Amino acid sequence: MKPITIRPYTTDVETVKSVFYDKSTIDFNIDEDPRFIIDVGANIGLVSAYFAHRFPNALIISLEPEESNFEILKLNAKSYKNIVPIQKALWYVNTTINIFSTNEGNGGFVATDKKYNSDTSRNMSENYSLNIQPKNSIVETITIESIMDDHNIDFLDIVKIDIEGAEKDIFD
């Protein structure tokens, strides 16, 4: 593994422990080396870096919409020629969406295509049991189909998804 960048005194430290010590995200067997991997909700790129090291011939597309996480993801991707960082959120349509902070550190936010207002905040707070606050971020989204078309991918070998509960919005 090549050196990685993390932010001290943040949730990055817990993420390092989860990825590299608990290995709950990455401990699996695969019969053949994958060609195409998508890391959705890449955060600062730790899983992407692990995949790039483990599968040096695979193309790894790393999606992360949150700006501060994406900046660190870009730093961590620089050491690997096979990681392509993209600052977009995975969604069911190519559009823009709002990001709401959950006040849970740099990993905690909720993406929605609903505009922020007190009703949205109350509804999302009840659904997620969180204190939702506007983060004033609008991010571009992309579909799996668009990613595959943009990178001439015919088959995805591995898809890692960690998107703060938005999985339901994408796959419903």
What are these regions (language model features)?
Residues 1-172:
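Phosphate/nucleotide-binding beta-alpha loop and adjacent structural elements of enzyme active sites
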